[in-house]
């Protein structure tokens, strides 16, 4: 697996931007109306109603590269979620890429928040690894892509092998996931806590828990920016017109990651809102697809 982003990857993605007539930026209502094909299978990874993943598998024989999708919605049930991600899942399957579309317990569900939401990320990836042979999934070729709150979670996934051993979230055996696409993500819980409060009306304690004698630093096992360097390759793709997670957020995180020694690049999506970032029908999608295919080593394969 390459250890750095190809220098041409972002440039190629920018060239994929559709020129000519530009559609109006998508609204929240446009986003909530998104849908896509039915999954190949729905697989529970825990007993709670929200502890499951949807598998979308291309036709034919594998092994297939995998994209793990983690939806956003401000960590709450109020703003859609896994259903909207089906539109992207369908577009990826058409490229010969399998998709593991993750649902998880959110802060306003029993067991959600800290530590439950993060435990669900562990369990969902364990389930992917367990089911990979049955469905011919190549978990050595894997990208985790998350939108908004899901961006925070996939960036956390990249660093979970650096969790303190004293953390309730620590695990000693993990599926490595080091190729990350964060779409309008809000990953730096400490430095973006005011923005998270403004954009999502989330108190940081819901996402990071309360300090205690055994865990005085609530960010040590929740904040992606505290878990670098971790050997990840991250593209932070943000709509030019994103007001939920403005481009500054991506630039600030990329600067920290690169200073720490990780590979991180910013991709600004021209004319795109926060919701265009996760719509396969948007002008932005072609740029994002170039990044995903490049991370999976498919850049020289015919684009379908």
Name each model feature, range by range.
Residues 126-194:
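Primarily recognizes the serine-hydrolase "nucleophile elbow" in alpha/beta-hydrolase
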Residues 236-238, 242:
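Short beta-strand/loop motif that positions the catalytic acidic residue
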Residues 24-61:
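N-terminal cap/lid segment of alpha/beta-hydrolase-fold proteins
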Residues 81-100:
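Short amphipathic alpha-helix adjacent to the substrate-entry channel of hydrolases
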Residues 272-282:
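Catalytic histidine-centered segment of alpha/beta-hydrolase-like enzymes
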Residues 27-32, 38, 48, 159, ...:
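Mobile cap/lid helix-loop segments that gate and shape the active-site cleft of serine hydrolases
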């Amino acid at each position: 697996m390459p250890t750095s982003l190809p220098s041409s990857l972002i440039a190629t993605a920018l060239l994929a931007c559709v020129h000519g007539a530009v559609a109006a930026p998508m609204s929240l209502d446009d986003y909530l109306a998104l849908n896509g094909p039915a999954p190949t299978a729905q697989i529970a990874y825990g007993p709670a109603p929200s502890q499951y993943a949807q598998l979308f598998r291309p036709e034919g024989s594998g092994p297939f590269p995998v994209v793990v999708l983690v939806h956003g919605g401000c960590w709450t049930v109020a703003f859609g979620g896994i259903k909207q991600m089906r539109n992207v899942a369908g577009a990826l399957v058409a490229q010969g890429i399998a998709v593991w579309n993750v649902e998880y317990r959110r802060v306003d569900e029993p067991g959600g928040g800290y530590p439950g939401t993060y435990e669900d990320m562990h369990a969902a990836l364990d389930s992917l690894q367990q089911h990979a042979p049955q469905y011919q999934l190549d978990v050595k070729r894997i990208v985790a892509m998350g939108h908004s709150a899901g961006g925070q979670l996939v960036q956390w996934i990249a660093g979970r092998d650096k969790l303190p051993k004293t953390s309730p979230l620590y695990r000693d055996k993990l599926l490595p996931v080091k190729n990350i696409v964060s779409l309008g993500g809000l990953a730096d819980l400490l430095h973006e806590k005011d923005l998270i409060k403004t954009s999502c009306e989330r108190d940081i304690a819901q996402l990071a828990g309360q300090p205690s004698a055994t865990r005085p630093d609530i960010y040590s096992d929740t904040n992606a920016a505290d878990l670098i360097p971790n050997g990840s390759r991250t593209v932070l793709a943000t709509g030019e017109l994103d007001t939920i997670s403005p481009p500054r957020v991506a630039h600030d995180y990329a600067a920290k990651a690169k200073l720490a020694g990780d590979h991180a690049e910013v991709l600004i999506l021209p004319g795109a809102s926060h919701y265009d970032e996760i719509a396969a029908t948007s002008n932005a999608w072609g740029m994002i697809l170039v990044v995903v295919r490049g991370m999976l080593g498919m850049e020289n394969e015919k684009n379908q």
